[in-house]
């Protein structure tokens, strides 16, 4: 499983999600990357108003899920569900 956090500067929730994802990464063992977007970046305009965004890829054959979350509890739930799905897909 691979998780990408899309962040911007001066985003306290982005920072909180980053540290939550680091904790979850050590617990569940997924690949994690944080990408900072800035004004002028094509994705910044597309995602404007929707930070932080989390991109979860459970397997190479499954499409990624880009989700807009509003709490660390929501983030933890989504990541644990995705990790369970990724483990199930590996077993198949």
What is each model feature region?
Residues 1-23:
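Local sequence-structure signature of Cys/Sec-based thiol-disulfide redox active-site neighborhoods
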Residues 48-55:
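Structural micro-motif
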Residues 44-46:
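Short glycine-biased active-site loop of nucleotidyltransferases that positions the nucleotide triphosphate
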Residues 2, 27, 31, 89-91:
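N-terminal secretory/membrane-targeting helices
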Residues 29-41:
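Thiol-based oxidoreductase modules, predominantly thioredoxin-like and allied folds used
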Residues 56-91:
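Non-catalytic, surface beta->alpha helical segment in thiol-disulfide oxidoreductase systems
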